[in-house]
């Protein structure tokens, strides 16, 4: 009995690790697609694609997964994908934006609407919550193995055209005008920095704490959205209560 229980626990951990790895590969695939779609499928002439391919290799993403994402961006196979943003409210009225990459708008809209409804939220019309967010360029440089202090990093970021920088134990987070993120990225790479992230994304102007009684329901909504293969990003104007994950 104990042997079965041990196997069950090991299998459970493996399944959880596989699911986490699958989500990472899913996110990288979308980033590869978007980079290739915007700047072409040749990494030699597309710095953003080179960055995403480096991340894919660092995550040990299979070569066939990388090729599939690039083929999709090049139109191989005939399917046409488009980017769509959905806006809605989670439990307790928390604002959420969902970015999707889909070849079937009806399928994606139905799945996202169902997720909101199932977890006590509601899908809104275009513009219903986007005014609560600001679009910014976002660059992340990991501090591990980086021999640069905060002051030097800030000066280099500002010289490259950044607007602001936040320092955490693990990373320097650099913010730019969304139209400048590519130029700032290139300038920092020319200075020798290795970037973990360089993209334009949405940031909430303010955040609301989810009531503890709604936290499980809220997390269920986010989990279901993250599990949707069409969803590329989720932007939240909410934080969970301390101690709740």
UniProtKB/Swiss-Prot annotation:
Coiled coil ranges: none
SUPFAM superfamilies per record: YebC-like
GO terms, molecular function: DNA binding
InterPro entries xref list: Integrase-like_N, TACO1_YebC-like_2nd/3rd_dom, TACO1_YebC_N, Transcrip_reg_TACO1-like, Transcrip_reg_TACO1-like_dom3, YebC-like
A GO biological process held by the record: regulation of DNA-templated transcription
One annotated Gene Ontology cellular component of this protein: cytosol
Cellular localization per UniProt: Cytoplasm
Keyword terms of this UniProt record: Cytoplasm, DNA-binding, Transcription, Transcription regulation
Region (Disordered): 1-23
Source superkingdom: Bacteria
Family to which this protein belongs: Belongs to the TACO1 family.
HAMAP family xrefs: Transcrip_reg_TACO1
Protein name: Probable transcriptional regulatory protein LVIS_1199
Organism: Levilactobacillus brevis (strain ATCC 367 / BCRC 12310 / CIP 105137 / JCM 1170 / LMG 11437 / NCIMB 947 / NCTC 947)
Upper taxonomic lineage: Bacteria, Bacillati, Bacillota, Bacilli, Lactobacillales
């Amino acid at each position: 009995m104990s042997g079965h229980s041990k196997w069950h626990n090991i299998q459970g951990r493996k399944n959880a690790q596989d699911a986490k790895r699958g989500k990472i590969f899913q996110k990288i695939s979308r980033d590869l697609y978007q980079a290739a779609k915007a700047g072409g499928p040749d990494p030699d002439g597309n710095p953003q694609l080179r960055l995403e391919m480096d991340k894919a290799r660092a995550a040990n993403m299979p070569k066939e997964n990388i090729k599939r994402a690039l083929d999709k961006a090049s139109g191989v196979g005939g399917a046409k994908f488009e980017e769509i943003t959905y806006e809605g409210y989670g439990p307790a009225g928390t604002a959420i934006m969902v970015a999707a990459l889909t070849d079937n708008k009806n399928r994606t809209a139905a799945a996202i609407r169902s997720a909101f409804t199932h977890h006590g939220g509601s899908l809104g019309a275009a513009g219903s919550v986007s005014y609560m967010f600001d679009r910014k360029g976002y660059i992340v440089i990991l501090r591990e193995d980086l021999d640069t202090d905060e002051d030097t990093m800030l000066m280099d970021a500002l010289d490259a055209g950044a607007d602001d920088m936040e320092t955490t134990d693990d990373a320097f987070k650099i913010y730019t005008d969304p139209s400048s993120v590519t130029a700032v990225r290139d300038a920092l790479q020319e200075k020798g920095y290795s970037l973990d992230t360089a993209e334009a994304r949405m940031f909430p102007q303010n955040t609301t704490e989810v009531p503890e009684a709604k936290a499980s329901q809220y997390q269920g909504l986010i989990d279901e959205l993250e599990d949707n293969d069409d969803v590329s990003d989720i932007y939240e104007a909410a934080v969970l209560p301390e101690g709740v994950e």
